[in-house]
Amino acid sequence: MEDDIWKAVDLSGVFDEDSVELRPRLTSVSSPSLSSTPPPSPLSSPSWSEEELPAPRSDGSPASSISAHKSYPKIFQTFKKDLSEVTVDRLMYPSFYERVQISIQTEDQSWLQRISARKRIKRIPSIEITEAPQENLASKLRENWVINPEEPKLSILCEMEFNEDFVNFFETSLRTLPSIGPPTILSYRKEYSCMDVILKDEQELGATCEFCGSDLQSLFFNMDTSLDDAGTKGKSHRSCCLQFQNLLDYITEERLTTKSPEMELISISPHAAHGSDADRLKAKEKAMQRKQERQMARHFTIIPEQSPVGTEEDTKHLKTISYQLSGDYLQNVRTEEVDLQITNISITCCDSWKICGKVMGNELLEKDYKHGSKFLTSFPDGTIQIFYPSGNLAIIRVPNKTDGFICIIQEDTATSPAILALFDSSGRSSCYHPNGNVWVYINILGGQYSDQAGNRIRTWNWSSTKPTPAFVSFKPVLLALNRYIGIRILEQDKVSIHFLAMGQQATICLGTKVVLQDPEEVPTLRFLSGDDLLLLASLIKIRRLFSKMEGCVNFPVSKAWERLKQPSYLSSLSLKLLALCQNSGIQQNIMETITELIKENE
């Protein structure tokens, strides 16, 4: 029964007649479970299967029943595609033709493995060897980067059962792969041993003279190049030519000049004392005498220049000159200002500070802005620090050496801030313009106000220093140093600094009360210098000369212009200038010069 089934299957193309062991075991041929799929319909059956089906037998053998129930594997049923137009090469794909049913073949795995091994041997395609055209290096590199689908390896993958599905799903991805396998850096490279390499021995070339070309080996063999023999004169056989002899002489001279001198070793063994005992005693007495002379010179004063100079005979007897550098230094003669020359002055400091209208004492206190940065810090010694909203230091007040405080105001700059104002409790203060010129300057006697160019606009004296009440009362000075700091000078004892930023306010008062016992000794207009008064006198003289020139132009023939007097305004200016000279307290010689300039008879 089993032999008849194999004859009906007709696998003579694959199995030999003697290979009975390769046939799988058939447990149940007529079992309905072996036909896993229903018979294909005539619409879906491929054309090539109809041509190769064997003719059914009339005797009703079991082979006819098996062929009637033949079916395709399940994988062919998933692809609902018409295969009528597919042409298959029988020689290349013999596995596509009718064979044993899949249900019978898959029963024994060992049988399938042996069959697949034989198929692999038969399906190896022949590779045609063709001469490759000559290509450059760039084309070879591009071939490694891109996979050519026409290569034999890729064609083997494409010639499969599902050609169209392979092309749709796998061909594009294979073309994008840069390479197949591990990176080239990991590839095996055979290391060649250097056992077969024959190394040649180095050959010493003979030394030849570069000047004449003669052999120098015998010359160096007979010549001694040590330093001991370098000073001796060269013999005739030592040089082959004059140029080479000059070179040897130059090298010898250089070696002698660069040769380090020999070290002389001294004896460190104990030796007897130099000189006799009497000589050592005399040396000690001389040392003691010089020491006493230096001590006496410290107590004596310097000999004045008027002292008589000794004669030459006296100088000859002097054997030892002893001197010592003086420890005195020149003291700088400090020119006292006019303010300090005034006697009987009583100065009282009026220092205080407030926060939001509340008077504060010398205590440790810290306050911050709303955004968290520090606003004010005060210490028990009276030091106060006020900061801008940016965090830069705005005002600092520190104790003075004698009494009171010193207050410094800086601009809102992180690096190298300029000083805007400087106040002192002793009565001296100054404020500056943004360009650095003095804006306001005050002292214990008065003050002056200048513009941005440095020109003095007005001056004043404090009420406590006025000798008579004839002067105009002082007008308050209000300054705004920047958008946060303002200065108010209402009186000598009412000088205040106001700081206002982001709702925080602080006020520092630095007033001074000065009481003079004799106000008459203070000049009324002490701010006017002699140079200013000389300029005013020269101005009056120039205007008077212009007035005379105008008279000459108006009366060129007549001499009536000689009888004309100077304008009345020049006369009044002259009187005012003389009054200024008397009130400013200038020197007498300057007063006489001004009087000569404003004379009317010139």
From Swiss-Prot:
Pfam families: FAM194. Residues 25-36 have a biased composition (Low complexity). InterPro entries: FAM194_C (IPR029281). Residues 22-67 are annotated as: Disordered. Coiled coil: none annotated. Signal peptide: none annotated. GO terms for cellular component: nucleus. It comes from the Eukaryota. Transmembrane segments: none annotated. It is found in: Nucleus. Belongs to the ERICH6 family. This is Glutamate-rich protein 6. It comes from Rattus norvegicus. The gene is Erich6.
